[in-house]
Amino acid sequence: CHELVPEGKIGNMLLGGLMYPLSCKPEDVFETLQENRSWQFFGDVQARGAYPGYMQRYFRDNGITLTITDADREALKTTVDFISFSYYMTGCVTAGEALNQQARGNI
């Protein structure tokens, strides 16, 4: 796009679904961090041009192997110019599974 239209802008569209811990318990805070990372990952790759360390660790810990070529790495460096949101909502996360289903919001 930038070669064809130098002033053109390329963006992405994400769901803004930020989660907050239901309590200040460390396990709720950690669970919230994990939950937010699971959806922020897509924007991180598109805006920063590389797979973030936390997802590389997730892939490694879960036996997921990606075949990424040098050409793929180069293509990822072509980042978006802006991020847009199609929908915004918040919810709460807790490490307690039963309560977590009630606290998560409408998705």
Predicted regions and their residues:
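Active-site region of glycoside hydrolase catalytic domains
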Residues: 1-107
